[in-house]
Amino acid sequence: MKKQIAVLVSALLLGGGAYAQNSVQAQKPKAYMVSDAHLDTQWNWDIQTTIKDYVWNTISQNLFLLKQYPEYIFNFEGGVKYAWMKEFYPREYELMKEYIKEGRWHISGSSWDANDALVPSTESFIRNIMLGQEYYRKEFGVESTDIFLPDCFGFGWTLPTIAAHCSLIGFSSQKLDWRVHPFFGKSKHPFTIGVWKGIDGSSIMLAHGYDYGKRWNDVDLSENKELMELAERTPLKTVYRYYGTGDIGGSPTVGSVRSVEKGVKGNGPLQIISATSDQLFKDYQPYKEHPELPVYDGELLMDVHGTGCYTSQAAMKLYNRQNELLGDAAERAAVGAEWLNLADYPGTFLSDAWKRFIYHQFHDDLTGTSIPRAYEFSWNDELISLSQFSDVLTSSVRGVASQLDTRVKGIPVVLYNPLGFSAKSVVEVEVSMPRAPKGVSVFDEAGKKVASQLLSYQNGKANLLIDAVVPPVGYAVYDVRTSGEKATELSAPVREGENYRVENSVYSMKLDANGDIISLLDKKNDKEIVKPGKAIRLALFTENKSYSWPAWEILKETIDKEPISITDKNTEITLVENGPLRKTIRIKKQHDESVFCQYI
């Protein structure tokens, strides 16, 4: 009996020793080492170079490292890049899938591609995540749980809300630390690790990953002073640290991988964790049980870098927004056509169109920061998607229209409203007519005359405006009749010395001889909007002192200066539309060899 008691006591002592040892380990500062090979889909190269060189380098180099180093975990984002691996490098793709099963090749970022976080609509941001997760489930049987954007030009307050509603738990980046020459200052990160609250109160965890190109040369990271200092800066005694390579893909260096492996096995004062991009976030779930986590409630915008991304390559912004709107309208119309048994819902076709343009929301593509040749591929894809959405929208609306009662006295015009609420708007339509009408009259479905305006007639086509009301996600039929009476034209702009004045029931506007708006009076509130001497004009800035990226780096000191007024040659001010629904003034200016036409 005494022997049994002695054995029991020994076991308890051994267990206590193990517990004490684990407690010491748990109390060590931690470093979550997150490998990455961030790959710009396009930037200083085009998509062909990405697929031929950088995608290949990424998959081949990391397969080598995964085979050689058992502690190595690789993180990589962008569903479209995985799709290219499957298409162009199928053998390596199958090998990679085995490491994904083992949890050593980690799917990061959740999305179809690492998108810009400011320009895309909320719908396409969510769609980007949905398309990425759909691919990951189908191909690998997994889902990602984080937003992984190491290199992106700022993050809106909507990001944590969008992420949380997509069941994601964390977000990481390093871009807000961009403070190199000539941009000196403090980091824009509110903290290195904490909770970010979105506009509706939804929250995700936020981690600052520092420089993603960090490397080491075969050292024991458990004794690394830099990592220890970073961990000790926070009350959490924890650092989340990217390492690897940036922009061109590839992999971390062998020396860096060996350093992490030595650190994992090391006995230094720092606990090294070879981590997936979301492991830190999972370790702190649920966040409510960790009051030590600081909370940030606001937006995280870049203020010194990439500050011209809203204006650079404006055509990309236009095509992207057209695709966002047309894609949504086409889907709603197609649902209606299917519900009426007029056509099968073209889900695969529509998904293909979304994928084709949405990967161009990548942070160096939609932002306008890539080389000109890259946009030849981008525009091509945007236009193909527009054509696909247009085909679905047109065929679906025609199908539904064929079921409507269009028996009217004149020419029937069917209007479709894809919005989720009733729309009252001035709509521009094109109507076939055998001869030019002097005027038109338009009637709604109740036979009530509505306001209209004939704009032009050419080659058997009349363009006109209709003051229309269309129900939500619905249709309305209008009756267009020609009339022998020409519509009464309204008064032209009133000349007041060298200035012009034009007004409606809401505003009274004055233009000077250069076409600049010198007065804009809100008649309902009796408030002048333009400050004296501060005319609203077409601005010209000629001294943008961006050091490296003048197309997409507009410095604050440039904007703060008074812009140059374009007054090189005589300005032409012409009334080009004059009717009850729309009055339009064209202002034509010239500066050097450029001609500018503005319409008000």
Give the location of each predicted region:
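Bacterial N-terminal signal peptides
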Residues: 7-15
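Active-site and substrate-binding clefts of carbohydrate-active enzymes
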Residues: 32-40, 190-407, 416-418, 465-467
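Alpha-helical scaffold elements lining the catalytic groove of polysaccharide deacetylases
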Residues: 117-135, 210-231, 553, 558-562
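CE4/NodB-like, metal-dependent polysaccharide N-deacetylase domain
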Residues: 125-153, 157, 165, 225-243
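Catalytic and substrate-binding regions of extracellular carbohydrate-active enzymes
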Residues: 347-351, 358-600
